[in-house]
């Protein structure tokens, strides 16, 4: 409906150009059509007249009046008013909302989706945990946000490629191998001989036992087998990484998260991508030698200081493979690249972008885009939950899913804006009450399914065609409020895609569920009059469809019974 009003306003502006009220060469304004905070101000409002007033050399209210008079007439608009300094408020006719409810039924799963992305490819990287231990709840938040961002982008017509970057090179992998070897030799974390910086969780003992048992790990088309040799560090390292990568993959699968691409940091070295990135930076003239190290003059590109690329001992800093990895994304044809990270990685953003700009290979400024998430605090019984026996020092994603369930875990981890800190209340997530938002939304969906079952049990045949034909009967306030809420869904999908904020979908679904429950409690649905009954069931089915569509974007199930 917003697009309908934009079209009417644009036609009105053209009419003002044609009659000389506006200069013929004036640029069309980037005006806003939005829903006012209160419905007393109409269903939609625009600032178009205020933006055009200067070009027209007119008072904004006077120009608003002229624009209102120039608007084409539409049966979907019942009233147009001028408010404040020159806002134009639109009141929609009930028929507009009734047609929108009918559109939901006809478009079904496609309702709310748009083609703004035009099928262009966007790479979405998320989780990207080191393969050194179980996924913690912070990784879980990254997984939920990243997966939902990709789903929302798909709904906005993008071709989202989901990517996991494994940091399988460096000191942390060596510490993993040393920790596993120590466990193989019977050394516990509190005993002499335990490696400095070793991983202390009980899961390391699991890795060690599997290695010595000759267990096999199937991972992306290849098999890694435990060599049973306690002194073969290369074999231990390879097995430990494969074992823990597989464990992480199992947790992500249980969480409903999958990836198109698993990219290994080690491949950047093996395939010459790190060397290529360094060569491009040197060729561009933005590097210099100092103190035996190779530096990037990243301050030329907005960084707060120059960055070391190659240390005096010949090894590269983490910055270099990060730049090489993002260069590979560009070379793979990603028109957009979005990286979901913990907020503690904020310091790396400017340097990676500076490195990409310094290559001078056509990568645009602001590429890649970043979504940063804050920490998660897990509460149970009013107290913070910190430890996991399996991980040793943190509460794992697997622990959380086992306690709260997949749906509640996904919902709660994306329910707030990514850059805000999140408190996950396990007790609330397990409640089957209206206080639990995921239960409240899912129950609205299940309630419609129950209505249809009740109708069938009573021998009342639901005729959808008859219901669509009689939606015009539903002009009471509660029905129109529900239709109004339903009609917001396409706008929410678009807004979530632009802002990369899937929590907007969760917030909307709570509001839609509230509108539905309010309508349900105040509206007898299974009435004797067939036309009324079919119309009400059709409206209920429209609400159910939008609830299902929105829950799908969040990766949360839409149950038929609860």
Curated annotation (Swiss-Prot):
InterPro entries registered for this protein in UniProt: aa-tRNA-synth_I_CS (IPR001412), Arg-tRNA-ligase (IPR001278), Arg-tRNA-synth_N (IPR005148), Arg-tRNA-synth_N_sf (IPR036695), ArgRS_core (IPR035684), DALR_anticod-bd (IPR008909), Rossmann-like_a/b/a_fold (IPR014729), tRNAsynth_Ia_anticodon-bd (IPR009080)
GO MF terms held by the record: arginine-tRNA ligase activity; ATP binding
Motif range ('HIGH' region): 129-139
Subcellular location(s) per record: Cytoplasm
Reactions it catalyzes: tRNA(Arg) + L-arginine + ATP = L-arginyl-tRNA(Arg) + AMP + diphosphate
Keyword annotations: Aminoacyl-tRNA synthetase, ATP-binding, Cytoplasm, Ligase, Nucleotide-binding, Protein biosynthesis
Domain of life: Bacteria
Name of protein: Arginine--tRNA ligase
